[in-house]
């Protein structure tokens, strides 16, 4: 809002783009790249960053302290054509308690700040009534870690259920999955469940600080399958630091263990399970413990993809990967 107000004032005063940039640079937390000169050593490393006169020597990171009082847009532009994310989005909290070593957002958006359930219900209803959307997503880095999730779900269901509005939880944790909560939330439309184990073996999950065990993953799937779910999405990464071929094959082994769990808990069915498996190409991110880790080559990534493909034979598994 401060930048928008500054822009409005600049337009009203007839300021040039450069004059506007000088004004907006006075706002705490705003960085204008063109106001800084970078010099380098002969080996290509950074020697110095020199600000122009009037620009702050160091831009201070600015953090929204209170999410309940922060601006949240409930009146959004509704496209005239169908779009991919054709739904309302509600940010329930910012930050993450987990600390996965590959996750840039988990480190950059600290500390954790949550909104109240009452305030979220109000924002959700305003957004849905203004947009006319038939689905709303409770967005965050780890939605199931929100402490007031059940109270929020109850409040939203009172509004959404009679209007046939779907309530979506995009980021679930295998170690705190609640079948009762999911049964209540998905009364309108039972969609698939999505989990991100990220690595195929416990050794590698521990190395990346993905604090979820194979037992928790299988137990969660058993709970979901016994509740009537027959579709699950699994996300992994290839090329994580210290990853070996054993870890890659471990992804396929975990998939087959999930298939066996479905056979034991899916109402005795032999068919009907859908496992959507996806692998991403790991890219080391700045400000994470893995920022200096080596990235595998595209050729090595595809070799690991083909290794995984060679170990996937079940017809119920749809495997997709990044080709570039």
Which residues make up each language-model segment?
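N-terminal [4Fe-4S]-dependent radical SAM core
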Residues: 33, 39-89
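Conserved SAM/AdoMet-binding glycine-rich loop
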Residues: 125-274
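Short, glycine-/Ser/Thr-/acidic-enriched flexible segments
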Residues: 35-37, 77, 94-98, 107-110, ...
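N-terminal pre-triad scaffold of radical SAM enzymes
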Residues: 76-104, 128, 169, 192, ...
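Short glycine-enriched, charge-decorated loop/helix-capping segments at active-site entrances
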Residues: 107, 207-212, 291-297
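Conserved structural-core and active-site-/substrate-pathway-adjacent residues in large, well-folded domains
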Residues: 1, 30, 70, 95-96, ...
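Iron-sulfur (Fe-S) cluster-binding segments and ferredoxin-like electron-carrier domains
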Residues: 103-119
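Glycine-rich beta-alpha loop elements in corrinoid/cobalamin-binding modules
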Residues: 1-50, 286-324
């Amino acid at each position: 809002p401060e930048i928008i107000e500054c822009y409005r004032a600049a337009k009203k005063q007839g300021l040039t783009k450069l004059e506007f940039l000088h004004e907006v640079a006075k706002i705490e937390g705003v960085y204008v790249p063109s106001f800084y000169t970078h010099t380098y050593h002969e080996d290509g490393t950074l020697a110095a960053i020199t600000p122009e006169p009037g620009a702050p020597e160091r831009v201070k990171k600015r953090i929204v302290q209170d999410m309940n009082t922060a601006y949240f847009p409930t009146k959004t532009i509704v496209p005239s054509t169908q779009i991919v994310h054709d739904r309302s989005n509600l940010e329930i909290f910012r930050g993450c308690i987990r600390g996965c070593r590959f996750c840039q957002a988990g480190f950059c958006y600290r500390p954790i700040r949550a909104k109240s359930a009452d305030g979220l219900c109000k924002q959700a209803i305003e957004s849905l009534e203004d947009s006319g959307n038939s689905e709303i997503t409770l967005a965050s880095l780890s939605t199931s870690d929100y402490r007031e999730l059940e109270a929020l779900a109850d409040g939203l269901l009172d509004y959404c259920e009679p209007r046939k509005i779907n309530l979506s939880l995009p980021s679930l944790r295998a170690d705190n999955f609640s079948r009762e909560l999911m049964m209540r939330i998905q009364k309108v439309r039972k969609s698939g469940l999505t989990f991100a184990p990220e690595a195929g073996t416990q050794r590698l999950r521990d190395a990346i600080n993905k604090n979820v065990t194979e037992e928790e993953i299988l137990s969660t799937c058993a709970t979901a399958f016994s509740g009537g779910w027959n579709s699950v999405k699994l996300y992994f990464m290839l090329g994580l630091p210290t990853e070996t071929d054993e870890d890659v094959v471990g992804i396929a082994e975990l998939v087959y263990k999930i298939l066996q769990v479905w056979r034991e808990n899916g109402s005795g069915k032999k068919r009907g399970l859908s496992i959507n498996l996806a692998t991403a190409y790991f890219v080391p991110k700045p400000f994470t413990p893995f920022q200096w880790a080596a990235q595998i080559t595209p050729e090595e990534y595809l070799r690991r993809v083909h290794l995984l493909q060679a170990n996937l034979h079940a017809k119920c598994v749809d495997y997709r990967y990044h080709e570039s």
